[in-house]
């Protein structure tokens, strides 16, 4: 475990610091982090409680929301999709936040609820019934369906047809449980009920869910001499009103309070957590005094209730079937620890049965097996989530600035800097912590957890987690933290092997996701950086192909099951003629008829296709050099076939509207550029259409491609924007020191690494999705992708239906699946 980066605020006056304010943070499956700070805003009369949101790749670009919470924010919770956030405060107010225009750095309050004046101590979204299980023992199996299986799990509440109903549940300090349901029409149904008849103070609480659709709430009044109470909560809708039913479950007393030697040593319960949101049978408890803590892990089990002999004699039938009861049993306890300041639990859905734990140990798969404890002395420790045995440790000294003199630290009377809030990433390979100075620290958690693993085992575990993210759609940034340049090639090859083993339907679903994953991996090594360009170009080609084919309509409605796009593919594969007009006459051209404004509006996308074909063919003589972008396309039969189909379609559209054709600068006025390019493209495609037996291009084809620069002006391709993310700078293992609001200066080698493939800052900017030139100083507001850096305008300049259809594809996410963020005005 080591430090990736530390991000801090600009120096503020000491009077603005409120150390007594508790801090909270939450980490979404899309690698967005929401957190609070303990700083006063002295410019305003009232204390404003801000919520800060950042993406882990650009931590300096923090977006601060003036939350409107008048009291301290006590809870933050992301939903399963990572696109909505709940916040709750010490006045009983709950707010639901959503992205404005799907921008990760622009948020607005959507709806909310309130329990007037009653502080919220626990908060959770209702369960949507989706639960996936990781089968570590099947990591070598080819099928993703066997590695990651869907677990039967009922939603907390269902609508008509079994669709899960959205909403949230919260527990207040006075012992109330409140549930708010979001109806499809936007209305909010809220109900509040007491957890039990005798209400008592709730200092700590947590919420978990059962497979049967029930909710389990654990509460404690903060005293270790009091029992930890558990309640079953059932939510229903009766006559358009939300109804809550509660039932008391077995409670427990902490083991440390029943031990005579330590009965009064740990008077306060400071942490109460279920080991997982969908695992209500296991709970972690932590009791503390002023200097030290002790942690205990408990499990709820069914046990037989022994009957007295008298009852067995009275009723022989009873003795045949022993009655069962639920009882809490302690699994493990730690020795006396330094005082615990924060706890973070893993989100990786690994089963915690004894068999599964044994399998994980045998396969040496440790991610998800450990939970993190932060201590008041500044240290962080990973302990096994069941046995509570230490697995890894990070000492607080490594978090301090190296330039700070050690003597000065020893003489300082102030308490040690420590984490007040801690959260684990969704693959359990990273930790984020908020310390007493308001700094945000990103910690790498090694997959080996301190054990010695050979390279092949480490690669296998990283590959398994990448596959998990591919199947679930979660962002994989935290996995990239552990990928070294030497691993990239092997990981990409293995990932492709596993992908090709899946059935055709699943491959189609995951086709764009695996390309985005390969691109982000290849960015981490200078030897594979050109392949990033190829993967982005392939994503763009697939998207254009799908969009243009979707515009085609059958001439007669009662046509066979094949769409015009499918027939285009079939005929282009069947007729291998190098003459574009001979291929075209085999198609029903009436299916390609579109109105003139639509064709003209597509010209920028058509121009990119034409330029890309010309660039690829002109680079064929240099195919021995793998450092040139586009190299992988020259042996990719499927992509060349797609380009060939697009050329045929464009040729037909050119007959209807010649101005929509791609524009080439030719040396001869009589030259048919499209026919020439189609002929060369077809010959290249024939060489590699059979992927099992590809052959090298013949000399005559290479000679003709060598002549292309003398016949046509070869365009410069705009491959990808210069990446300003943090991930490639974290490979040195030295912690980076960053500041909120100030982008770091790009290292000199970064510009050299990308120089051949990107525009320099002084060159005119381009809209990478619309293929529009924006000028050197764009006047339109733009947004960029948090993952690949793709830039596009916020508002559409077009009104054509076909272009709107293209733009609607990228309204929520980039073509690589990354989130959008609004670009600062300095871009313009």
Swiss-Prot record:
Coiled coil: none annotated. WD repeats lie at residues 68-107, 199-241, 264-308, 622-663, 777-816. Its main location: nucleus. It is found in: Nucleus. GO terms for cellular component: mediator complex. Component of the Mediator complex, a coactivator involved in the regulated transcription of nearly all RNA polymerase II-dependent genes. Mediator functions as a bridge to convey information from gene-specific regulatory proteins to the basal RNA polymerase II transcription machinery. Mediator is recruited to promoters by direct interactions with regulatory proteins and serves as a scaffold for the assembly of a functional preinitiation complex with RNA polymerase II and the general transcription factors. Belongs to the Mediator complex subunit 16 family. PANTHER family: MEDIATOR OF RNA POLYMERASE II TRANSCRIPTION SUBUNIT 16, THYROID HORMONE RECEPTOR-ASSOCIATED PROTEIN-RELATED. This is Mediator of RNA polymerase II transcription subunit 16. The gene is med16.
């Amino acid at each position: 475990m080591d430090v990736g980066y530390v991000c801090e605020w600009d120096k503020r006056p000491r009077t603005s610091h409120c150390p007594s304010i508790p801090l909270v943070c939450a980490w979404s499956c899309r690698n967005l982090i929401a957190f609070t700070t303990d700083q006063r805003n002295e410019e305003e009369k009232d204390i404003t409680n801000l919520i800060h949101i950042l993406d882990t790749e650009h931590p300096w670009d923090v977006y601060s929301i003036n939350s409107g919470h008048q009291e301290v924010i006590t809870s933050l919770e992301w939903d399963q999709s990572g696109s909505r956030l709940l916040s709750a405060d010490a006045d009983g107010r709950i707010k639901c936040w959503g992205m404005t225009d799907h921008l990760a750095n622009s948020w607005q309050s959507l709806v909310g609820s309130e329990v007037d004046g009653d502080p919220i101590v626990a908060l959770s979204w209702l369960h949507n019934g989706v639960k996936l299980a990781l089968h570590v023992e099947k990591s070598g199996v080819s099928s993703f369906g066997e590695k990651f299986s869907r677990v039967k799990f009922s939603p907390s509440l269902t609508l008509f047809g079994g669709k899960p109903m959205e909403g949230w549940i919260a527990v207040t300090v006075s012992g109330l449980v409140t549930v708010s349901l979001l109806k499809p029409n936007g209305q909010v149904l809220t109900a509040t009920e007491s957890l039990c008849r005798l209400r008592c103070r709730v200092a700590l609480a947590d919420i978990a869910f059962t497979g049967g659709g029930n909710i389990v709430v654990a509460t404690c009044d903060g005293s270790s001499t009091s029992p930890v109470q558990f309640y079953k909560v059932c939510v229903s809708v009766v006559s358009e009103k939300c109804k809550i039913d509660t039932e008391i479950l077995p409670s427990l007393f902490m083991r440390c309070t029943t031990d005579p030697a330590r009965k009064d040593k740990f008077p306060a319960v400071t942490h109460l957590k279920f080991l997982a949101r969908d695992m209500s049978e296991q709970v972690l408890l932590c009791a503390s005094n002023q200097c030290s803590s002790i942690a205990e892990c408990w499990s709820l089990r069914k046990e037989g209730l022994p009957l007295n002999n008298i009852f067995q004699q009275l009723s022989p039938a009873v003795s045949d079937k022993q009655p069962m009861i639920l009882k809490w049993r302690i699994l493990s306890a730690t020795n006396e620890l330094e005082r615990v300041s924060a706890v973070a639990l893993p989100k990786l859905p690994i089963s915690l049965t004894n068999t599964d734990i044994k399998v994980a140990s045998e396969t040496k798969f440790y991610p998800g097996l450990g939970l993190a404890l932060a201590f008041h002395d500044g240290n962080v420790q990973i302990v096994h989530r069941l046995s509570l045995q230490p697995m890894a440790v990070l000492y607080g000294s490594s978090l301090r600035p190296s330039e700070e003199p050690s003597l000065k630290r020893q003489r300082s009377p102030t308490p040690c800097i420590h984490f007040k809030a801690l959260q684990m990433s969704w693959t359990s390979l990273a930790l984020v912590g908020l310390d007493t100075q308001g700094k945000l620290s990103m910690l790498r958690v090694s997959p080996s957890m301190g054990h010695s693993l050979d390279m092949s085992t480490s690669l296998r575990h990283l590959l398994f987690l990448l596959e998990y993210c591919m199947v679930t759609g979660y962002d994989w940034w935290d996995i990239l933290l552990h990928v070294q340049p030497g691993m990239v090639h092997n990981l990409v090859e293995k990932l492709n092997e596993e992908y090709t083993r899946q059935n055709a339907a699943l491959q189609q679903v995951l086709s764009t996701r695996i390309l985005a994953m390969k691109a982000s991996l290849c960015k981490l090594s200078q030897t594979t950086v050109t392949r990033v360009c190829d993967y982005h170009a392939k994503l763009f080609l697939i998207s254009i192909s799908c969009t243009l084919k979707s515009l085609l309509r059958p001439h007669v409605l009662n046509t066979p099951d094949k769409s015009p796009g499918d027939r285009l593919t079939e005929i282009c594969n069947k007729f291998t003629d190098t003459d574009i007009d001979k291929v075209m006459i085999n198609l029903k051209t009436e299916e390609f008829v579109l109105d003139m404004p639509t064709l003209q509006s597509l010209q920028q996308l058509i121009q990119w296709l034409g330029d890309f074909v010309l660039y690829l063919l002109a680079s064929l003589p240099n195919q021995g050099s793998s450092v040139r972008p586009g190299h992988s396309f020259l042996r990719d039969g499927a992509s060349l076939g797609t380009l060939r189909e697009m050329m045929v379609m464009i040729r037909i559209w050119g007959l209807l509207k010649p101005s929509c054709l791609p524009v080439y600068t030719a040396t001869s006025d009589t030259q048919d550029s499209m026919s020439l390019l189609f002929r060369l493209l077809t010959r290249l495609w024939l060489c590699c259409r059979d992927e099992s037996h590809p052959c090298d291009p013949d000399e005559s084809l290479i000679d003709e491609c060598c002549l292309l620069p003398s016949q046509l002006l070869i365009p410069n391709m705009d491959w990808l924007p210069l990446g300003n993310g943090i991930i490639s700078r974290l490979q040195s293992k030295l912690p980076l020191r960053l500041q909120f609001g100030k982008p770091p200066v790009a290292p000199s080698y970064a510009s050299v690494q990308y120089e051949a493939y990107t525009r320099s800052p002084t060159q005119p900017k381009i809209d990478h999705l619309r293929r529009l030139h924006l000028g050197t100083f764009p006047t339109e507001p733009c947004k960029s992708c948090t993952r690949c850096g793709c830039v596009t305008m916020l508002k559409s300049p077009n009104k054509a239906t076909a272009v709107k259809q293209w733009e609607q594809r990228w309204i929520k996410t980039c073509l690589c699946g990354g989130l959008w963020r609004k670009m600062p005005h300095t871009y313009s």
